[in-house]
């Protein structure tokens, strides 16, 4: 069976390196789906988060889908913009995939999907030789980021710290798999939002 091809607009999956942006679960290449970037024969095109205007303006043929992944704290104003321009958005997109309750209440075009997904590539029980890690970044654009940075200052060298701006790692496994526990603080908390940090 050949894989169904969809175009993907947005840089959400730039960490994937196999040429097919469409890993499925745990870093394995999808069996039935292939993400492409500019295939005129694709079944349709998915636009991720802030690429919403690309879908409205780019003139691509075929079905278009909007996929909202990030929290409302990271993509501030995006949901409000969709609500304010609801008719245009609904005329442009076949389906809007989201975890935002305000959008889900607007009608059948809006379908629930969990925010984000898995980042761990090899699901198994790992041998543990260290106690506590924390994966964070030095971003501070929203309250959750600032809370994480406060924790980083408080815990100091009591945990092994990884992430952008600290001890940078390529894959989350480097900061999780060898540890009994990992401190996770999400950048937002609200109904129907689910963090990949729990799954990782």
Residue map of PLM features:
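Nucleotide-sugar donor-binding catalytic core of glycosyltransferases
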Residues: 1-200
């Amino acid at each position: 069976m050949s894989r169904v091809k969809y175009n993907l607009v947005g840089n959400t999956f730039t960490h994937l390196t196999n040429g097919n942006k469409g890993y499925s679960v745990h870093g394995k290449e999808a069996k039935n789906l292939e993400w492409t970037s500019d295939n005129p024969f694709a079944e349709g095109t998915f636009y991720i988060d802030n690429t919403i205007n690309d879908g409205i303006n780019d003139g691509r043929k075929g079905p278009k889908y909007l996929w909202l992944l990030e929290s409302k704290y990271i993509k501030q104003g995006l949901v409000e913009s969709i609500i304010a321009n609801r008719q245009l958005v609904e005329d442009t997109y076949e389906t809007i995939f989201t975890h935002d309750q305000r959008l889900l209440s607007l009608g059948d075009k809006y379908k629930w999907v969990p925010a984000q997904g898995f980042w761990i590539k090899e699901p198994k029980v790992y041998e543990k030789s260290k106690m506590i890690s924390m994966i964070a970044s030095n971003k501070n654009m929203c309250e959750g980021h600032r809370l994480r940075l406060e924790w980083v200052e408080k815990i100091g060298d009591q945990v092994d710290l990884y992430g952008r701006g600290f001890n940078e790692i390529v894959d989350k496994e480097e900061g999780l798999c060898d540890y009994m526990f990992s401190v996770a603080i999400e950048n937002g908390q609200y109904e129907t939002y689910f963090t990949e940090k729990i799954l990782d």
